[in-house]
Amino acid sequence: MGHAAGYGMDRPSARRKLKRRDPNRVKLGKRNRRSGRNFERNVFARLTSLGLPVYKVPMSGGLKATGLIPQLKDRMAGDLQITIADKTYLIECKHTSAKHKVVELAESVGACHIKGFCFMFTESDFINYLMGYPYNCTEVEDERHKWLHKYFDQDNSQLVVIGRNYKQNIYCVHESAMEVFSHILDKNGKFINKRS
């Protein structure tokens, strides 16, 4: 049976419904969420192995996104949280396949500073920074880094960990938190809980 003109599958809303129900899109979304959860677990395991007081946020954004419990919004922010000197700082974990020049620069030089924004470290340089050792840093202008600003602004995080397949993680520390995370591990790799 035919449809009257203007009704049926040529309507934008009908096309959107079909697009939403596409099983391949559903599989892709599930796969992305699963890889994101696995990456969060790996970052959690790595940071706790360094002796840092990191804990997971339950449902990592699930309750916050639905807005079911507005009173818990601040407690449910970020993927991971770390407590230093009785203050909680947020860690956002992002696993991506996108290529960004500044990430590749950080991988090649070890550490770079996006002026007025954040510092990016490879894992070995990040550990040196946590222990208070000096590090060489390449200066970069804050241009074309909107994607990284979004990562920090998502939950107002102080630390963003970027993971890519077959590459080492990049740890991005917001300028406002540089003093907080610096020298929180002693020379033996033990956590030092700074008191303000």
Task: Annotate the PLM regions.
Residues 2-196:
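Catalytic phosphate/metal-binding cores of nucleic-acid and nucleotide-processing enzymes, i.e., regions
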